[in-house]
């Protein structure tokens, strides 16, 4: 199907403009240097140069797997995966800092500059070498903020010090920055619906170790599959960023097949998950 060549981005005072969705060299070079330093093989067997057609049936099964995933922050395997995710996220952030791109966070009571479309961040980087991120403390899921969760039960809410313009950022703030940079904007993927989010998962997944990938998958393809193909699929198809019904925040890891971009469940697990999907379809009419 090929990667889209352009996207329409709203602009202040000029309506909307169509821009070519090219990779951003500074970010791509930072990603390559990081992987080389870490000894990570960028060619892990999955083609991320194109824009593969999304398998919606599989995405619905991933959504069901995310729903069934236990919120299990004290599980040693879960803890190890999230600790690896955080450590590697901070390493990726240091690599991004060297690009000279200004990493800003939205100040309280300030209009979000990408409110009309998150794709506006692409133009901001290309034109102004700036990326603005919505802080975790201002929104973390549907109708909740970071203050609604206990840090002891969510390692992503741990304070990691200064990130960009924020002195007391959380690990989740750092992950939001690097995922937008390395998953979306750097590869020329300023798309934030289901296909763009899955491609961001494929792009950014390459930069993580096997230890971190299960947690990274829960935070990306797990949550995004639930958002786009879970129980609120019909509502979210036309919802704005403010009205979208997001996935519940959980600290856990999905089955191995769900973290593998081409994996599929089978046997009793497939039947159990398909039953959940069928119930969603029935409820949505």
Regions flagged by a language model, labelled:
Residues 2-3, 7-8, 12-14, 226, ...:
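Compositionally biased regions
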Residues 2, 39, 100, 236, ...:
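Short, flexible coil/linker elements and helix-boundary hinge sites characteristic
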Residues 86-90, 98, 103-241, 246, ...:
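Core of folded catalytic or high-affinity ligand/protein-binding domains
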Residues 2-162:
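Glycine-rich short-loop/terminal segments
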Residues 230-284:
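Charge-dense, extended regions
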């Amino acid at each position: 199907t090929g990667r889209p060549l352009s996207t329409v981005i709203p602009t202040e005072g000029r309506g909307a403009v169509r821009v070519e969705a090219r990779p951003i060299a500074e970010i791509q070079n930072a990603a390559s240097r990081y992987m080389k330093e870490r000894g990570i093989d960028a060619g892990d067997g999955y083609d991320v140069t194109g824009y593969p057609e999304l398998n919606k049936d599989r995405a619905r099964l991933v959504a069901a797997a995310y729903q069934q995933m236990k919120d299990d922050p004290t599980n040693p395997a879960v803890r190890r995966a999230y600790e690896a995710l955080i450590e590697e996220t901070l390493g990726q952030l240091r690599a991004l800092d060297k690009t000279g791109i200004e990493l800003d966070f939205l100040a309280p009571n300030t209009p979000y500059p990408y409110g009309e479309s998150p794709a506006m961040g692409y133009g901001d980087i290309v034109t102004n070498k700036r990326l603005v991120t919505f802080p975790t403390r201002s929104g973390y899921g549907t109708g909740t903020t970071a203050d609604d969760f206990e840090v002891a039960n969510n390692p992503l809410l741990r304070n990691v010090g200064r990130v960009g313009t924020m002195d007391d950022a959380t690990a989740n703030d750092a992950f939001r920055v690097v995922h937008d940079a390395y998953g979306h904007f750097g590869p020329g993927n300023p798309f934030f619906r289901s296909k763009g989010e899955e491609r961001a998962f494929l792009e950014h997944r390459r930069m993580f170790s096997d230890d971190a990938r299960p947690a990274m998958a829960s935070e990306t393809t797990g949550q995004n599959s639930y958002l786009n193909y879970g129980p609120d699929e019909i509502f979210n198809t036309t919802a704005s960023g403010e009205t979208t019904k997001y996935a519940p925040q959980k600290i856990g890891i999905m089955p191995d097949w769900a973290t593998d971009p081409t994996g599929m469940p089978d046997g009793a697990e497939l039947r159990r998950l398909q039953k959940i999907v069928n119930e969603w379809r029935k409820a949505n009419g």
